[in-house]
Amino acid sequence: MSLPNPAELIRQMATDLNAHLSKRGISDPRFIGIRTGGVWVAQALLEALNNPSPLGTLDVSFYRDDFSQNGLHPQVRPSELPFEIEGQHLVLIDDVLMSGRTVRAALNELFDYGRPASVTLVCLLDLNAGELPIRPNVVGATLSLAPNERIKLSGPEPLALELQDLSTAL
């Protein structure tokens, strides 16, 4: 399978996000990336938008509903939100939407900080593997993977996608 170029996806996502926000009458949203890949995508997206806004970051490790099964990620860091959440229009950015559980955890954490006016979900990739009814408002590309395949985003400079075959991993 040939994977898309993240830089090209980001450029198209910037155009699509501007159109989406304009259609909804949103002129000054707050941007939040989900660690780690979502932060990289958010940084690239803000650059493509030529937007100097501060970037918030979320680490949703403690909010995941599979925490008891998978344990705590070894590099948990605090979330950093350099702006108010209450009443704000938010753009929540993740790298890969798979089950929807990471986004659900991010929404739960955001609502602990306040009630936003709206949340626009932006994802570099949607893998159409949702276990929860969560869909991005803006997406770079939609891919279908075999059950033994995963996508890994590396970065931040340059952003690159890698297809991993879990059946050959030791």
UniProtKB/Swiss-Prot annotation:
Keyword Transferase belongs to the record: yes
Pfam family, one: Pribosyltran
Alphabetical keyword list: Glycosyltransferase, Transcription, Transcription regulation, Transferase
GO biological process: regulation of DNA-templated transcription
Zinc recorded as keyword: no
InterPro entries listed in its UniProt record: PRibTrfase_dom, PRTase-like, PyrR, PyrR_bifunctional
EC id: 2.4.2.9
Motif (PRPP-binding) on chain: 90-102
CDD domains from the UniProt entry: PRTases_typeI
Catalytic activity: UMP + diphosphate = 5-phospho-alpha-D-ribose 1-diphosphate + uracil
Highest taxon above the source species: Bacteria
Gene3D superfamilies: 3.40.50.2020
SUPFAM superfamilies: PRTase-like
Task of the protein: Regulates the transcription of the pyrimidine nucleotide (pyr) operon in response to exogenous pyrimidines. Also displays a weak uracil phosphoribosyltransferase activity which is not physiologically significant.
HAMAP family: PyrR
Protein family membership: Belongs to the purine/pyrimidine phosphoribosyltransferase family. PyrR subfamily.
NCBIfam families according to UniProt: PRK05205.1-1
Protein's name according to its UniProt entry: Bifunctional protein PyrR
